[in-house]
């Protein structure tokens, strides 16, 4: 297919804006291919024309990693189910789909067949390709990265080749592609291992901050799914714990900020505290917390709800936001949270900076067995994953020294802790983040942490590579980069990723926004 024919199927007046509204771009051409063959032709045209391609889905990464002035591709039209194979003896099925299919669409299709995705992150708007490309995870002592549910991938690499990948066929490329940052190839098809549909019976408790820390050793392994929302100014935590059940659904929990009125009031109060009177922030938190959750500690007697797996695992992310998420060993959690608590309190007293809430605290188990276990004794409500693969992505940001243990032996020593620092952008207006995020990153880094690839980590000019500006020339929210630390953290795995990237994309078709890759050590300047 000639370039003229390829370009004839593209738009030249398209503006891409990410969900948070922080970044936007106007690509030279915007493509929405209708087939894998069209993807191949677009890649070959890019090689011929010396262009780069970025693939985007829902745009939920709040960073600038997808910004480009060259070619942009969206796979929403690649949304077909290719094959559905049941393994009734071990209670799972392998579903093969085109990778532009959104997760919420896949969940609807699976529900019609009596199946569900095993574990999800906070949202379901991502595509099948996008959800694994930056290391999405849920919150569970038994489940790890969403990519561990993937049996195989089909990619179009930077040579225009259609390549099938799994644990046996090109396992090294598979490890790179299951967390690729969009730099290995375009994922066009995937097979995901799913399980019989289930509901989640959850208990939601209001507890004191100290209660969380005092029960740290046992809380995190007390349910299959668990997460906390920390409100530092009120010194309260909302503890959510859930397990699979076949019990019928109950009425959803009431949500003050889930109403149009509550949501508007909350966002308006944030706007006032950001733009007019920052010292109001702790009082806004207290008011909102009491409206949403009440005033009484309910540890051991929280409210119980039965939801679909999707409703239970997803959450309302509220407003446009900056997000800085880091992961570290769970055993370092109490020290980290006490340090952050002290810093947040001191900063408020000195009117240095104020944080928005909640600060989300989650865990995952990204340790992997040497081989896929026997699942013949599972039931529909058995805890834990049915692995699609047991290969760790080279760029997995979770701690590397943690060792696998069977579900019955899992302790905090197998688990990674994720802490999510969020600053809202009320009504689409920016809020200051640099002081808080820098302190947060220093604290997490000292605890053996690393940032989530897709989030708004800042880094520092001392760690960056490529075009480094004077500190005064950066916008408050602008990423400086972390090249030197990322090289140190990932070591041989990063070198292997680079080698595979060069092999699969020798023409640098997928090196759009090269500055982002350089300042974070993905490639050399």
Swiss-Prot record:
Enzyme class label: oxidoreductase
Pathway(s) of this molecule: Cofactor biosynthesis; D-erythroascorbate biosynthesis; dehydro-D-arabinono-1,4-lactone from D-arabinose: step 2/2
Catalytic activity, as annotated: D-arabinono-1,4-lactone + O2 = dehydro-D-arabinono-1,4-lactone + H2O2 + H(+)
GO MF annotation, one: D-arabinono-1,4-lactone oxidase activity
EC numbers for this chain: 1.1.3.37
Signal peptide bounds: none
Modified residues (Pros-8alpha-FAD histidine): 60
Highest taxon of source: Eukaryota
Pfam families with a match to the protein in the record: ALO, FAD_binding_4
Entry's family note: Belongs to the oxygen-dependent FAD-linked oxidoreductase family.
Listed GO CC annotations: mitochondrial membrane
InterPro entries: ALO_C (IPR007173), FAD-bd_PCMH (IPR016166), FAD-bd_PCMH-like_sf (IPR036318), FAD-bd_PCMH_sub1 (IPR016167), FAD-bd_PCMH_sub2 (IPR016169), FAD_lactone_oxidase-like (IPR010031), Oxid_FAD_bind_N (IPR006094), Oxy_OxRdtase_FAD_BS (IPR006093)
Domain FAD-binding PCMH-type: 23-197
Keywords noted in UniProt: FAD, Flavoprotein, Membrane, Mitochondrion, Oxidoreductase
Phylogenetic lineage: Eukaryota, Fungi, Dikarya, Ascomycota, Saccharomycotina
Named cofactor requirement(s): FAD
Protein name: D-arabinono-1,4-lactone oxidase
UniProt KW Nucleus keyword: no
Compartments, record wording: Mitochondrion membrane
